């Protein structure tokens, strides 16, 4: 295992209900990637955009070569095939890690899932299949963060095997999206710096997102 290598997998909702937040999502993502570049650590990035289709735009790219996300890649449309996006991402990473030499396998694997609505159009994976996959990967040290708007993110995360303390319900507005990416960026930076290969996530990663959400009530 290469304890200096981190695999980041971003699964970003671009379904039609994200309309109006395109520039915030693009800017937040680009800012987060810039932070990882500046950190200078060995990080590979996979980025998956989903609506009723699943589109892989970065396939384990070294973070230093990632070009800024633009409206050419991130544009809203369609429904929410969340389970298909997560299942595709897990199977892809699982297959890669399985076939790499032991000393090339990542010491840390972190999935970041964002959605602003409930699953409504997956065709290839069921909720139970995803739950089993995630629970199996968590036993091997993989981390999963789940950020959801317009839903009870904790409840929806638990349905697919992600603990409540790895989930947060965010406010689906410009500030809420901005805080999402900042919080995730900080959490990832701390994880990348950590020497641990298990339990390396900051337990308070979502505090600022939650505080903003509560303040909007």
Residue positions per predicted region:
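Acidic, low-complexity intrinsically disordered regions
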Residues: 1-217
């Amino acid at each position: 295992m290469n304890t200096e290598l981190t695999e980041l997998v971003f699964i970003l909702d671009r379904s039609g209900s994200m309309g109006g937040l395109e520039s915030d999502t693009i800017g937040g993502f680009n800012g987060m990637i810039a932070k990882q570049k500046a950190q200078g650590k060995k990080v590979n990035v996979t980025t998956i955009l989903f609506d009723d289709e699943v589109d892989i735009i970065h396939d384990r790219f070294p973070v230093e070569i990632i070009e800024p996300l633009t409206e050419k890649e991130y544009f809203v449309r369609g429904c929410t095939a969340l389970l298909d996006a997560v299942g595709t991402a897990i199977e892809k990473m699982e297959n890669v890690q399985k076939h790499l030499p032991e000393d090339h396998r990542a010491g840390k694997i972190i999935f970041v899932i964002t959605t602003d609505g409930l699953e409504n159009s997956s065709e290839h994976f069921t909720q139970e299949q995803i739950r089993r996959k995630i629970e199996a990967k968590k036993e091997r040290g993989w981390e999963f963060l789940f950020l959801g708007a317009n839903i009870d993110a904790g409840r929806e995360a638990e349905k697919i095997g992600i603990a409540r303390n790895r989930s947060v319900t965010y406010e689906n507005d410009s500030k809420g999206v901005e805080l999402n990416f900042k919080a995730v960026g900080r959490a990832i930076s701390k994880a990348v710096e950590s020497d641990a290969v298990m339990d390396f996530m900051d337990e308070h990663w979502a505090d600022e997102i939650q505080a903003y959400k509560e303040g909007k009530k």
